[in-house]
Amino acid sequence: MASPSGQYIFGEFSDDEFKQFFVTARCTVELPPYNEHFFPCGPQSSVDFQDDMHLKFSEVIHGISGEECPRIEFGIEQVVDRDTALNNNTDYSISSNLNPQAPEFILTCSSFPKTSNNVLHENNFDAINCQFSESAIPDGSGNADSDGTSGTGQRERKKKKKRPPGYYSYLEGVGDVPSETLVNGHANSTGLDSISTDDPDLADDIPISTTSPRTCTSPDNFVDLINEALSDEASMHNVLDNARTAGQPEECSVTSSEQSCIPSDNGSESPVRTAVVQPFAGTDTTENLGVTNGQTLESPEEDTVSNGVVLHPEVSSFSEEVKTEETSTAQALIHLSGSASSNPPAKSWASLFHTSKPSSSPQVAYVETKNAPTVVSPQVPEKQVEIKEEPVPVSDDPVAIEFAELLEEVKLVHKPVSLQPRGLINKGNWCYINATLQALVACPPMYHLMKSIPVYTKAQRPCTSTPMIDSFVRLMNEFTNMPILPKAKQAPGEKVIKDIRPGAPFEPTYIYRLLTVFKSSLSEKGRQEDAEEYLGFILNGLHEEMLALKKLLLPQNDQIHINNCPNPVSGVEEVNKEEQEGSDEEWEQVGPRNKSSVTRQADFVQTPITDIFGGHMRSVVYQQSSKESATLQPFFTLQLDIQSEKIRTVQDALESLVARESVQGYTTKTKQEVEICRRVTLEELPPVLVLHLKRFVFEKTGGCQKLIKNIEYPVDLEVSKDLLSPGVKSKIFKGQRTYRLFAVVYHHGNSATGGHYTTDVFQIGLNGWLRIDDQSVKVINQYQVVKQTVERTAYLLYYRRVDLL
């Protein structure tokens, strides 16, 4: 086998090498250490087999020098069983893209001189069967290649000048000597060693054959390979201790009874179970045969490449002779599986792995395939379990009583809290919601109230009667405290130099869903999105949920009708209606100068929400020859009309609110027209005062326009005594009617049916102002807060009482 010139390693393979190189999906070979002694591998006992193979590898790989060679990896993608029905099939051929000129395939060291015994062993030794052949001339079995220059041969001829001597000898052969199929692009040494390829004259006389010789006498079909694998199993265990395949644990072993090759006998209706022989103990193998070296197997129409083996849909044929050992082995394997053998239709190697399933046995991997085209079912995303947010009655709420008791004992905390600001992601038209939420988060009593309510798990509270409270408790818990910095000396309007690091923005989808849970009119498509209306929706919703809980603590006989929605004073018609119908909650009140009036108050129960935002207005109707009629009406926001040209500031709008109003055309029961006057005053001021500048005016034609005018508003607002009701003027001190601005909601744009909302909030930790536009958070100075432009106008003003700061 060795010659004075450089010799190619890719010559002869033992049966275990062939399985590792061409059967296993991914193989590696660790060559054994160099051995100085040489014993020819002939028909010997299994005890000597390991030493013989040991030396054979050492001689071929190491040579005389005994130098270590690097770890070499080989592999294929698919395995095809040989069957007599595929003898003349022209669908497939095998070629190689391994480069035999690579350094790891060429022996650079000189070989030792041949002896007569060595020459005999080299010429007649069969590395696959580990035995000596009867003749140096190969037998008549072989696979013919339809085109000797096709595949890799055609590509390699383009670089013929760069190839070593004898490289193209596998394309030539003696016409009367049958040649064998190429294995990795090398000629069979048993057939070519007798012919010197170094003699150019002799090489020119050799005609080019239609078939190409192959390097080693590899099995002609897969059954032969299994037959050889089953024989001499005990010897194989010792030989393969040094040959390991990547991925298989060392303790994995294969028994002969578990290896089977079972072709289908039912045509396309039955699946084909193919046993892919795994390496014996001490080997590694990949678990997923459907993927080779990180690449998914391609469709049969495309060429498949894996570690140097290329599968082309070209003309190919198998040997016509089948050994008797192969037939007997195949029948034995079929008997073990309980399935009869038949001629399966020709299919590509890749099709065997399209529906691969893992085997229950760790030793043999089975691949089950049907001839019908594989239908890939679309991946259905996992259905996420959504928490049912539809409110249930308080009687079905397991923690309703506990919740109600907590609300009874809660005490409002007005201490400022420094929170790390976070933007809100807006993936829809939610700017009016995001702007309102940022203002509520900046309200200390609102934040402390929600933080005092515990967060219940789904197990503790499988259903809820307070989805709105739960959502706002969750919202406040999204924000974390930030240490309060020392108070900086800053004059009003001075530029803030400090910087702040906001937290990561988030999307409060649970808040957005409340609109559909309560079927609010704000969720109607195409409806005007109004920040003030949304604020009323929130405050009324929270108030009603707390009210329902508080009812649980009242005795059954004390249940009374409760007005759940504080609304602004509607008008004189409602007052007159109440006068006609009468009310149980009315009393006569003597005012200044001994003037008496009948006062009516709607039934109203306090909740923590009303304790923060709730105030009362007193509406008095003056009529000739009658006592004054007064009505107390709760409110969450003060509606300020700014349409008049005289109104330029917030103070002007407040004075206009309490101005006396005359009503024309009012008649009594006797159909007599009388003059009526109406005046509204502030009876009770809330801790948090929200002023609504009514910029959207409805026209007689039914349209709506935005009032684009600048209304000046101060940072510190003092409510004049003239705005208070006569009975409370002396009771409310200056500190209780002085407020400080902490949030402003702006409306951007000139249209009343569109636009954008942003918010400016006061940050106690920064001791300055932040401008929040959905996800954007930036520091601004106080001058930018009170300054308005045509494009951006103030819409909602949030004030806190200074005596509670």
UniProtKB/Swiss-Prot annotation:
One of its GO terms (molecular function) is transmembrane transporter binding. Residues 143-153, 284-298 have a biased composition (Polar residues). InterPro entries: Papain-like_cys_pep_sf, Peptidase_C19, Peptidase_C19_UCH, USP_CS, USP_dom. GO terms for cellular component: cytoplasm; cytosol; early endosome; nucleus. Residues 422-802 form the USP domain. The active site is at C431 (nucleophile), H756 (proton acceptor). CDD domains: Peptidase_C19. It is found in: Cytoplasm; Nucleus. It is an enzyme of class 3 (hydrolase). PROSITE patterns: USP_1 (PS00972), USP_2 (PS00973), USP_3 (PS50235). Residues 136-173, 284-305, 573-600 are annotated as: Disordered. Keywords: Autophagy, Cytoplasm, DNA damage, DNA repair, Hydrolase, Nucleus, Protease, Thiol protease, Ubl conjugation pathway. GO terms for biological process: autophagy; cellular response to interleukin-1; DNA damage response; DNA damage response, signal transduction by p53 class mediator; DNA repair; negative regulation of canonical NF-kappaB signal transduction; negative regulation of stress granule assembly; protein deubiquitination. It catalyses: Thiol-dependent hydrolysis of ester, thioester, amide, peptide and isopeptide bonds formed by the C-terminal Gly of ubiquitin (a 76-residue protein attached to proteins as an intracellular targeting signal). Its EC number is 3.4.19.12. Belongs to the peptidase C19 family. USP10 subfamily. Hydrolase that can remove conjugated ubiquitin from target proteins such as p53/tp53, rps2/us5, rps3/us3, rps10/eS10, becn1, snx3 and cftr. Acts as an essential regulator of p53/tp53 stability: in unstressed cells, specifically deubiquitinates p53/tp53 in the cytoplasm, leading to counteracts MDM2 action and stabilize p53/tp53. Following DNA damage, translocates to the nucleus and deubiquitinates p53/tp53, leading to regulate the p53/TP53-dependent DNA damage response. Component of a regulatory loop that controls autophagy and p53/tp53 levels. PANTHER family: UBIQUITIN CARBOXYL-TERMINAL HYDROLASE, UBIQUITIN CARBOXYL-TERMINAL HYDROLASE 10. This is Ubiquitin carboxyl-terminal hydrolase 10-B. It comes from Xenopus laevis. The gene is usp10-b.
